[in-house]
Amino acid sequence: MTRVLVVDDAKFMRVKIREILEEANYIIAGEAADGEQAADLYKKLRPDLVTMDITMPVKNGIKALRDILTFDPKAKVIMCTAMRQQRIVTEAIELGAKDFIVKPFEETKVLEAVSRVMGH
């Protein structure tokens, strides 16, 4: 089973992703509300996949992505973005993010991105 770390500063967004993924039989390994928590939890939990919000307090998603990829260059991270963040998404993909999903989350788009990244 694929274990996922869900990262977003908005609890309702984490809940939405959790519901979509659990319904599709993914296991939520953990949740983080900022990039610093995300990097720490990644190191502890070693999930198969991370969904990472870009705009967060303490440490944003780009910085957390860098930290995670420094720790584990093979990490699979999907960035979660608002519509008008194309430049930042491009930066994240160039850094090593595997895919992105746009808010508000649509179940099919989330599951398609996860399937692409996980090779299902």
From Swiss-Prot:
Identify the keywords attached in UniProt to this record, alphabetized: Phosphoprotein, Two-component regulatory system
Q: State if Nucleotide-binding is listed as a keyword.
A: no
Task: Give residues where 4-aspartylphosphate occurs.
Answer: 53
Entries under Pfam families matching the protein: Response_reg
Q: Which PROSITE patterns match?
A: RESPONSE_REGULATORY (PS50110)
One Gene Ontology term of the biological-process aspect is: phosphorelay signal transduction system
What the entry lists under InterPro entries is as follows:
CheY-like_superfamily, Sig_transdc_resp-reg_receiver, ST_Response_Regulator
Response regulatory domain mapped to chain residues: 3-118
Designated name of the protein: Protein CcdB
Organism, scientific name: Bacillus subtilis (strain 168)
